[in-house]
């Protein structure tokens, strides 16, 4: 049986302890067989349609675009059960785990959306669920932590390192090394050791496939660009996959610039990283001059990751996709703008992609069609944003008062 290519150009691979190689090979074989199994595909499709709520809508914004020449469409993954695109591939991997006879699921989460999606899939399919989450993220994503626990998941706060997503990934991988005979590691993004980047892409590619069909029905042509935020990169690769061969469609990923690319406070390895080995793969990585992993930063927990999926690295290297960035301030501004102009509250992650789309729309000099993957809803972020805005208001009042003295 033909095996999948573990590399995308020079990126990817299986850089894991020898003890995990049998588990990864078992997973690859199970995935290849499942892709060819009509019963598996039927069950997956049925869950996506009747449980998760696919296909999701493609919404033309009425007031968001600052330019009459540019139309901005939103692919509404925020409407999916669970509140984000994460549900798609989690259902696929959970079904794979059952197919392999696993009884437990181990997962990592940043914003909590992958954790919530994993918890709901485990509840549905009667699997034990353990979720590793950086202690900082536990603090800033308390609604999602409660959701996970409500659905029966055990949430384990990780206090090592920066206490964020990369540390949760390391702990989850460590746990899996000791329990892979009974547990499946349900990785949450299109990164990590082969075959995860390929599996996650294939279980997310319906995002772009639906978008292509919907935009052709609505506009009679393909979009000029599809735009998605990039942390590890699963929502973006799900959107890009069906457009990669459509050369006239620009693929634009938006990384978190945090406090600015020229500061240490960002999470943009494609713009500012060097190739290294991390999390079982060869990929661009934020590292210092001695090769130590730098701490990534973003206002959005789900983008706070020091590396990126290997297929994105390859798309960037070949020039097929371009990767831009948006700062915390730009994302916060667009988070509020979408809420006020369209009555839709986006996830802070998605707001990074929206911020760049608005910038592109403003600069359009001819009729332009843009599609943004609205990867998740913003319920989980409202308290974070409220705190930031309150602090900004207080700082501004203090400045005004000192100016009047």
UniProtKB/Swiss-Prot annotation:
- What is the documented function of this protein? The beta subunit is responsible for the synthesis of L-tryptophan from indole and L-serine.
Q: Which residues carry this modification: N6-(pyridoxal phosphate)lysine?
A: 86
The protein's name is Tryptophan synthase beta chain
Which chemical reaction does it catalyze?
A: (1S,2R)-1-C-(indol-3-yl)glycerol 3-phosphate + L-serine = D-glyceraldehyde 3-phosphate + L-tryptophan + H2O
This protein's pathway: Amino-acid biosynthesis; L-tryptophan biosynthesis; L-tryptophan from chorismate: step 5/5
By sequence similarity, the record places it as follows: Belongs to the TrpB family.
GO molecular-function annotation terms?
A: tryptophan synthase activity
Arranged from A to Z, the UniProt key words for this protein are:
Amino-acid biosynthesis, Aromatic amino acid biosynthesis, Lyase, Pyridoxal phosphate, Tryptophan biosynthesis
């Amino acid at each position: 049986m033909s095996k999948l290519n573990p590399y995308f150009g020079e990126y990817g691979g299986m850089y894991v302890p020898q003890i995990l190689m049998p588990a990864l090979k078992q997973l690859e074989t199970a995935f290849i067989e499942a892709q060819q199994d009509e019963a598996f595909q039927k069950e997956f499709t049925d869950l996506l349609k009747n449980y998760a709520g696919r296909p999701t809508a493609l919404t033309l914004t009425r007031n968001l675009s600052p330019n009459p020449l540019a139309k901005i469409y939103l692919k509404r993954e925020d409407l999916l059960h669970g509140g984000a695109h994460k549900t798609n591939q989690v259902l696929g991997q959970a079904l794979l785990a059952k197919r392999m006879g696993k009884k437990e699921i181990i997962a990592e989460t940043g914003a909590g959306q992958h954790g919530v999606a994993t918890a709901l899939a485990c509840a549905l399919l009667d699997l034990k669920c353990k979720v590793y989450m950086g202690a900082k993220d536990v603090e800033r994503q308390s609604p999602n932590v409660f959701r996970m626990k409500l659905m029966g998941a055990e949430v384990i706060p990780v206090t090592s390192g920066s206490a964020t997503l990369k540390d949760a990934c390391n702990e989850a991988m460590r746990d899996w090394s000791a329990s892979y005979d009974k547990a499946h590691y349900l990785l949450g993004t299109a990164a990590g050791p082969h075959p995860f980047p390929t599996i996650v892409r294939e279980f997310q590619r319906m995002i772009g496939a639906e978008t292509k069909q919907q935009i052709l029905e609505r506009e009679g042509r393909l979009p000029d660009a599809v735009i998605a935020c990039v942390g590890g990169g699963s929502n973006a690769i799900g959107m890009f996959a069906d457009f990669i061969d459509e050369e006239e469609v620009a693929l634009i990923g938006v990384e978190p610039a945090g406090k600015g690319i020229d500061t240490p406070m960002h999470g943009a390895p494609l713009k500012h990283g060097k190739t290294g080995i991390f999390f079982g793969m060869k990929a661009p990585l934020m590292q210092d001059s001695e090769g130590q992993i730098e701490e990534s930063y973003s206002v959005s927990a789900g983008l706070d990751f020091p590396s990126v999926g290997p297929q994105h690295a390859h798309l960037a290297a070949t020039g097929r996709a371009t990767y831009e960035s948006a700062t915390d301030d730009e994302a916060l501004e667009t988070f509020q703008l979408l809420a006020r102009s369209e009555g839709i509250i986006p996830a802070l992650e998605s707001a990074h992609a929206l911020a760049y789309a608005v910038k592109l729309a403003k600069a359009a000099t001819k009729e332009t069609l843009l599609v943004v993957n609205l990867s998740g809803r913003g319920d989980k972020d409202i308290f974070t944003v409220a705190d930031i805005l309150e602090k900004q208001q207080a700082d501004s009042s203090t400045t005004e008062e000192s100016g009047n003295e």
